[in-house]
Amino acid sequence: MNTKSIRFILGWILNIEALLMLLPVATAVVYREEEGIAYALVMAVCAAAGALMTYKKPNNPSFYAKEGFVCTALGWILMSAFGCVPFMLTGEIPSFVDAMFEMVSGFTTTGASVVLNVEELSHCTNMWRCFSHWIGGMGILVFLLAVLPLVGGSNMQLMKAESPGPSVGKLVPKVRFTARILYVLYVALTVLQVLVMLLGGMTFYEALCTSFGTAGTGGFGIYGDSIAGFSPFLQWAITIFMIAFGVNFNVYFLLYMRRPKDALHCEEMHWYLGIIVAAALMICANAYDVAMTLEGNLRQSFFQVASIITTTGFATTDFNLWPGFSHGILVVLMFVGACAGSTGGGFKVSRIVIGFKSVLAYLGAFLHPRVVRKVKFEDKDVDGETMRAISVYFTAAISLFTISVLLVALDGFDLVTTFSAVAATFNNVGPGLGVAGPTSNFAAFSDFSKVVMTMDMLLGRLEVFPMLMLFYPPLWKESIGEARIRRNRSPFH
């Protein structure tokens, strides 16, 4: 394994994180908050560590899938570890387990929180929490690819390891330009939302924090009631933007290239929008509140469905109080998730649809054994390798999810709380049901359960395999063997 290349890229991740910490520092300056000193200190340490790790560029630029997985997993852990330090230095989240949980929740765009009252946090800390969603939404490594020429051959491996969905491809021939296009679209949509939020009456600080949380489909808020205190106009606007950020960004690229027919022909988007409309109407009928207008009921239903399926996690109502049927729909949506190639989490609509079509094809084979039935998606035959990858992903994800539920169950909470809390963290949704519901948080769980769910958030955001690779013994045995061979070949040995 090429450890020097991994070290080099991890160093650049710290350099980028140091640069990004300028925003909470600037926020502290604007609001004259002493907490900004902690962010400035950590920013300096990040920059120093990054400079040391990138001082010498690796001579051997070879970089393969295993390095991509390891670098991605270590990068997210390292970024979260440095990012959580200001929480402890300011005393706002003094426990390392809690601070790490909060920061991982931010970067993985989960939005699950252990903070009892977010309104008591400093402006700079709330800005950093919300900004972490925006950073993690598209991915720190995709940002790195957009702005820096990395070691040879590493670009596609890093993008595959970090990008959500069953496959990742290039929008243009060079991966670096693909990353740039993705970020230009991401920034453009974010700026558009900020402008709409300002138009709806938000302050610039509120608009920026809310837009960061929406764009990254994260869900950290700056008020205890999340989005409930804002006007109906803003709630509808946020609903639309949540849905928009849950769409595959290839669709926006096609629109930018003036190919609207190709963009609107996206099968995954059709399923995604259809699921949203169907789920919202069913919840509206099931949880209809006669004390509210039809518009109010529709607004709450569409908002919560959009929030859960895109794994954003904002709330305008306490859906803990909804009937059991509505709870069931929300839990299913947690697993379905948004589109591949979006900033959303979950299993992804494309995987669910391909899996559903595979079951139908398998059943059809029993009726007509001699007929070759191929699974089609986006007007193309799904190849065997993609089918195998999806099956392996489902098996690994469900197995890890089950283990996590059993471990968190040791806390003694009811099954609804335990199951939904793990589902909310594994699928990067944020709020669950019961004790982990939208009006509560995850502070009541033990440190052990918080560590388990912190791992779940990383597993879910990186789609299992990069994190699993860190615990795969043959990888490290092979790396140790390669190191011994290099040492034996050294003229100084």
Model region roles, listed by residue range:
Residues 1-493:
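Membrane-proximal intracellular helices of multi-pass ion channels
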